[in-house]
Amino acid sequence: MLMVRAIIRPEKVGAVLSELLSAGFPEVTKMDVFGRGKQKGIKVGDIYYDELPKEMLLVVVKNEADKDDVIRIIMRTARTGEKGAFGDGKIFVSPVETAYTISSGKEVL
């Protein structure tokens, strides 16, 4: 199993979740997060924002093919414009060693 973590613009979350659901990936965890990338924040007038609001989506997939599908959906849907822009986000993929259902205490992987 693999965990796909995507940090994206808040205004793109609805579209990404809808596309994931349509493609057969209904199980998603969403979290509000704050951070910055290469640009180290932004300046608007006299105000400097060093941490920007983002959303993190966590999707656990069973295999490489599903991982590739999820990444393709997120990339296509979360990108700003045809070429993308600073602040569109990042996607991280990591292995999931094991998982447990809290209510039953059973291992689910």
Regions found by a protein language model. Name each.
Residues M1-L109:
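Positively charged, small/polar-rich N-terminal and surface patches that mediate targeting and assembly
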